[in-house]
């Protein structure tokens, strides 16, 4: 039975009882209250149908079960709103008083996103996916009490990452349920970034919030595209979009990315599967004392075992060999080591306590990217304190950058949120002086398709934690 039919039946029932029993006006109102009560119960039942999409499925210890029960606090539930509106409509129609009927609104109320801290008041956030280290030489770490003790000394650091990861899971869940073809890139970026701001309870601060500009690269554009103000680009049904989201808490950056497609014929399935499996392989191979070359070789073997058919032609899926995973430092997204996605001979080892972004890119094109297009991504270079800004305007802009972003990456839209206007000339001066680094979009050949998946991993002394893992990828 539909909701509308149920309401009508409820109204008829109330009126019939009122006629039979000759109820007074206040009795009628009491009956209506009971009806409202039943409708509210129905609303509650509908709301409880939501699952915990933001949590990590693999962990079923008591702490995580306690924490994960709060994940639905701010989920939108349109059906809840429909039922609540219906209950209110019954209340108006069932009254014996001659009241002017209120026009029903078709707008559905959306629950306001609230800080993640309200869901986890004790400050303990869900852990990621735990994986054993593969090397036999590391087996002693799993049982060593000393190793576990050393790990506990960094609990605050790990909780910062876990908080950022939980925000990331919620933001990407909202993005996946909301993004549709026809939206502009500006609309998509605002949706994602405003969600981060709401969950983190921060706008542009060095305490928590956006870790880097939201990447929304389409098709042959592999990375480093986010819209500048005035960009009219819209998402098309046949576009393959890489969504790269960064969230930081006290400078601990969670860097995780996924690829979205809206084409219903499954033509992108092969490249999506190839890149997702390649990233999972990189995560599996990573660990303390593992050589970076060995990770790249394993990723390459998986990625290049796939091919993709487009318009009757078969294309091998290639690793984009000049894109890599990377070390993550406090407030520094690319810190020191790079994790190749092809065998490159790098014998450098991963070390205990390090944090890495394991990301892979697959392409139907050349498997090599070059900078092209209008720049939107920027970051302050380190060790530039001795360089004098070339003008007063450049000095003013540098102060704005340092106070709002530090060494975190940012984009033009973020500058404008701080109140900066007519800043492009000063910005270019800072770039030319080497104080600020620009990161233009990087692209493979036109007509090709690229995909990306990425996770942040923490190398604990005894195990590795895939902190950004979720039910989705």
Swiss-Prot record:
GO terms for molecular function: initiator methionyl aminopeptidase activity; metal ion binding; metalloaminopeptidase activity. Residues 73-83 have a biased composition (Acidic residues). It is an enzyme of class 3 (hydrolase). It catalyses: Release of N-terminal amino acids, preferentially methionine, from peptides and arylamides. Residues 84-93 have a biased composition (Low complexity). Keywords: Aminopeptidase, Cytoplasm, Hydrolase, Metal-binding, Protease. InterPro entries: Creatinase/aminopeptidase-like, Met_Aminopeptidase_Type2, Pept_M24, Pept_M24_MAP, Pept_M24A_MAP2, Pept_M24A_MAP2_BS, WH-like_DNA-bd_sf, WH_DNA-bd_sf. Its EC number is 3.4.11.18. PROSITE patterns: MAP_2. A divalent metal cation 2 binds at residues 255, 326, 359, 454. A divalent metal cation 1 binds at residues 244, 255, 454. Gene3D superfamilies: Creatinase/methionine aminopeptidase superfamily (3.90.230.10), Winged helix-like DNA-binding domain superfamily/Winged helix DNA-binding domain (1.10.10.10). SUPFAM superfamilies: Creatinase/aminopeptidase, Winged helix' DNA-binding domain. Residues 97-113 have a biased composition (Basic residues). Its cofactor is Co(2+); Zn(2+); Mn(2+); Fe(2+). Residues 23-121 are annotated as: Disordered. Residues 41-53 have a biased composition (Polar residues). Binds 2 divalent metal cations per subunit. Has a high-affinity and a low affinity metal-binding site. The true nature of the physiological cofactor is under debate. The enzyme is active with cobalt, zinc, manganese or divalent iron ions. Most likely, methionine aminopeptidases function as mononuclear Fe(2+)-metalloproteases under physiological conditions, and the catalytically relevant metal-binding site has been assigned to the histidine-containing high-affinity site. One of its GO terms (biological process) is protein maturation. GO terms for cellular component: cytoplasm. Substrate binds at residues 224, 334. Belongs to the peptidase M24A family. Methionine aminopeptidase eukaryotic type 2 subfamily. PANTHER family: METHIONINE AMINOPEPTIDASE 2 (PTHR45777:SF2). Cotranslationally removes the N-terminal methionine from nascent proteins. The N-terminal methionine is often cleaved when the second residue in the primary sequence is small and uncharged (Met-Ala-, Cys, Gly, Pro, Ser, Thr, or Val). HAMAP family: MetAP_2_euk. This is Methionine aminopeptidase 2. It comes from Lodderomyces elongisporus (strain ATCC 11503 / CBS 2605 / JCM 1781 / NBRC 1676 / NRRL YB-4239).
